[in-house]
Amino acid sequence: MLKRLSMNEFPQDIFTEPQGYSVNTLENLGPLTGMAGIWEGIRGMDVKPKAQGPKQQAYVERIELQPIDPQTNGPQLFYGLRYHAHITKPDQVKMYHDQVGYWLWEPANDNLIHTLTIPRGMITMAAGKAKASDKQFELHAKEGDCDAGISSNPFLNYAFRTVEFHIQVSIHDDGTWSYEQDTVMKIKCQEALFHHVDSNTLHKIEEATPNPQARL
C-alpha cells in the first residue's frame, strides 16, 4: 500500500509545481516501461463465482496502454499510461469484460497507482511501491481505505461486495508481461470470502505512440 504520510510530512508549499522535468513519458515510466504499447493475450484464465460454485473461464484480451503527458498536483509529479482492456471469450465477439483507467508512477517516492473502472458500476484505485528498475510489483486496494479504495453500485455491494483487490505484475526478459489478479468478494449468503482470480500473459503487437508533449 502507499505509505500514509502525516500532515507534517507533506510539503508546506502545496501549489508550486516542479520545473525542468522531462516531458517524454516513455523515457520516464520506471517500472511501467515494459507495459507501454498494444498487447494481446490469448491464454487468459478467469475463476468466477456461479451459483453452483467456482467456474473457470478462458479468455482473450487486447489491452492498449498509451503514455500521457506528465501530470502534476502542485509539487507532485506523475508519469503514466492510459489503458483500455477489452476481453472476450475465445472465438466470440461479445464483450466479456471491459476496463479503462490509468497506471501511474511517482518517481520522487516510488509510488505506483492503478485505477480501474468497469461498466458494472465499479471503480477501484490500487496502490503500491516500485523502484524504476523493478521487474515485478504488487498493488492493493481495500474497502473503506480512503487512499486505495473500492466503490461499487448498490446491487454489487448487496450481492457481490468487493472487499479487497490485489494485482501482481511481472515484466519478462522476452518482452512479454503478465499479471495475476485477485478480487476478494463477500457474496450474499456465503460465509467464506470468494477469490475471483484472473491471470494472463501479454504479447506486444504494436509499439506505443509518444505522448503529445514529446511529439512537439
Model regions and ranges:
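Transmembrane beta-barrel outer-membrane domains
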Residues: Q56, K94, Y158-F160
